[in-house]
């Protein structure tokens, strides 16, 4: 039976005294000046964390003092948290081009200007830019026509579908944008980093083409407003008859569009700052125009504007060629013909030959804007689709028709339909009016808090614009006559912009406002598209585009601007706003589709890095948005959709063709094997990206003689970490030879597989037979996994009762395991008290998972609670993070920085900074160190039986008590675990305690105690204390039955005749014990009731003579805690703030 005795020293009645100056002097001695001490660590440095960038001087300062001496060997690769937090919390991403600008200034030798930190908030940085990009040319030039053709009901459905598509995309985009810091690069960065370079490049180029064609659309809108509504006389090409007007207009659009494009490209080339300066002016024009529309709607309810339209029968007449809506007019007492008569008749005389329809039908004049109170909404409720060349007619008007087949003279002043219209065409034309939702994410580098601003600003902007569009559909249908709505260019209202006729106070507000807004939108497109192409080019994923990554010294994309202008010219040569709009709809819809796909894939995969701060998303919403985008692509134009998908597919294959390989197996299993082989070969190409890091576990378990797992809780914990979605290998080692123990290995594998299935652990099992345990574990660590699918984390249990083992190889194997994982750059998880860990059926209804973040080793400590809380066992546990502040640290600022850092990490946790100031090393620490070193000497230099070991250590402790009390009679308390275990017993036995109590307040024995106030003179004198010994029954029986000692008792006492003094202790061990004791006191105080405590695991010493001391340090560090997980990072595991 294993036994343990506890030596407890009760405080004296008098006041306690602190250690004398001599001991104090040694307690603060500089450890770097101690002779013969080796503090270089274990010789297996971990990989440097990507967050670490400290100088050697800083490293030297980080562990001055005693509080963190236990972790001083980690400082080369893992800095103290206090020295790291400020840089992480105050991370700022520079706007695109600022780095190149700084480099150019440095090359010129000029004085570098400080880069201003981003200061834009949600309103100015996201909301207003999104409004400016969403509201555009379609609202002013085409929405009234869409309502007139499709009717209020279908237009409402159209607007609702398109706005729903963008809203779902914005939700997905918000999830991606808040999944880490999004540097300058915006939507392309988000897509490419979420779906990989192939999809990212394909979708990025589609988004670039969409933005470029959007610039062409805005320029065409600008020219249409200029020539149709502002200065019609500026037209260069004029038609000889009505049938040639359309062709003349297209040529005018091409000429003026090319000129405007050249001017805009020049402005962008000269300096984007001018574009940004006028951005607010252009936005003000948009908002003012929209407010004018609503003001006009309100005014029309009680005072409609006067815009009469002329009808011949039920046919709408264009007002360009006449002024009086009548056939005849009275001049005095004489009846004369009007100009309208001359348009339909052969002469101005009453007996002239006139058009038959003109002769049979009357001319009437009605108000084009009856107003909101007119009840017109019922007439405009349903659709009136037209074919090309058809006259726009008013329903409900009496008309004397002509015989079927009678040709219509195109020279007559009717309002004709210029194109065949149908629902899907209108969707393609309208959809560009809801694009522009990426404007906020494109400015992510300029935002003060992108994770907060992008979701809030984008969703509010979409909600605002959607409300404006939906209300505009209803209000246009309620206020404007149907024939006017179907009149695309406002010919029936004297060539006025249709929406301008409704505006108040004047139609010119809308005309001028829409002109400047379309100019501004065109400039924004020509500014954003080249930068997007530059970002794609600099990624190097499309080799032939790399030339466009170069630019001016300040980072302006000169070559990319040139290519953008050339592509934009293609859209201008098309010259039709209605033809260009469906093209850019395809590219934007494809971009939005892949944004939704990225969010759905990330949500379903549940990778450890997927931690969006935006919570209101779901994979079903993303899938719905993706399906809606795909449907809208084919609704708008199925052939354009196929072309766009073909372009994206070709780009995808071009990017990945070097690594692509097709291989077909026979049957599903053959296909699976081929896919697995292909995936493993792809993984072999390079190490995984930081964002894709996840714990790939190698779980080391021990099996008993019946090949059953000794600690099944390890596999339960593995199952609870399955949110990491990584590889799991459960390994075990059997001692012996392969030929003799192969059957046992097979049984062990079957037993482990059954337990894995019961615990729902998805992974592989591997049992190794080796001549000794250390080599077997080393082989598992080195050879586990296949190709790129290898473990990066080792999970193992703490060696229970390591003090009680006859064979010291048990804890030596453990320390060698720590060294080998460090050498292999693997993370190590050590569970202490694993039998107390919960099984999968258990549930914690409350409690906390406490993280003690002492040194930064890559973020593994942060990741593990996040993964555990995804499991139902730990789901209701809150996460608390504690970090330690030293004397020179500002604990208040540390708490703020840590809170900011966790915000960037998208992790919700309570934060507390624990202050550990420099303090004198207590007598208890000296006593613990003394006994540790004495026991180490005994066990190393003498081979005693178990009973002798107990008796001699007890004797040494009693003899050294007087020396210790002379040095410091303060409150001392000593615990020694000296076990006894029956031979061959590998199972843990219940421990029984023997207490040796030194009662300083009890009266001493007269024969051995000095007189009052007298100090003991000889170190061999009996200590003036009353000693109580409590022995268990089993202990007594064992003491009676113990055999003769092979070593003389006198010889043992001669060996320890030297008296232990505090001065003779290794000061490095004292400082490390001081760290362990102080940290343990703080951790127990704060986290005694925690369901799980995670803390950094210090590395083992280089000098193997101190291995047992290392075990003792860890034991002291974690005592009095129920469930502990020691975490030692390898440097490759990183929990990143990036998306």
UniProtKB/Swiss-Prot annotation:
Q: Where is this region: Scissor helix?
A: 667-681
Q: What is the effect of changing residue 311 to H?
A: In DEE34; results in reduced chloride transport; decreased localization at the cell surface
Any Gene Ontology CC annotation: cell periphery
Attached carbohydrates are found at: 314, 333, 351, 362
Q: Which residues carry this modification: Phosphothreonine?
A: 57, 929, 1030
Q: How does it sit in the membrane?
A: Multi-pass membrane protein
Which stretches are tagged as biased composition: Polar residues? 46-55
Please report any disulfide bonds recorded for this protein chain, giving both cysteine positions: 310-325, 345-354
Purpose:
Mediates electroneutral potassium-chloride cotransport in mature neurons and is required for neuronal Cl(-) homeostasis. As major extruder of intracellular chloride, it establishes the low neuronal Cl(-) levels required for chloride influx after binding of GABA-A and glycine to their receptors, with subsequent hyperpolarization and neuronal inhibition. Involved in the regulation of dendritic spine formation and maturation.
Q: Other remarks?
A: Inhibited by furosemide and bumetanide.
Indicate what this protein is called per its UniProt record: Solute carrier family 12 member 5
Organism in which the protein naturally occurs: Homo sapiens
The lineage, from the top, is: Eukaryota, Metazoa, Chordata, Craniata, Vertebrata
Gene behind this protein: SLC12A5
